[in-house]
Amino acid sequence: MPTAETRDTGLTVRRTRWSRAALAGIFVVGTLGLIIWHANHPDALPTDDRVVSASTPVDEPVYVGVARGVEGRTLHLSGVKVHATSNTDVSVTPLLCRGGQVEATTDPAAFCTDLVNPEGEPFGVDDSIVLQLTSDQPAVAVIDPVRLGFRESFQWGTLPTGAGAVVRVLAR
């Protein structure tokens, strides 16, 4: 009866410790890359095509609501970035309106249970971002949608949200 003969053809692949370590390293780096990418890419915030219009006399602040909380999400704000263009100096201060929403008013207390600096605050569905605008001379200010710096769960980012605004500061 014939017997099987084993022959060495020299084409065998030998795995070394180095190749296993390299594969494990590639896997770890790839996994960390995906985690870091996911942490820096939260879901987009809603933007609005509408433009909020308001007017106020010189030296009297007006409060303009530009962004509302998002259903099902609570953001922990690190800041609010505002870009405004005007024909003269205007002061624009972002504020967090707790428990209410404002379109445009000179008395936000009627609509907000509390008006606070948004930095470090949670931003929920019942809250809104309000811009306080004032000028000591007549002006027209065009304000782009705000950008919120925030953390949500283990994701963080700075994204645009809300509506733009046009505010006219009128002479007395």
For the regions a language model picked out, list residue spans one by one.
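Non-catalytic macromolecular-recognition regions in eukaryotic signaling proteins
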Residues: 2-172
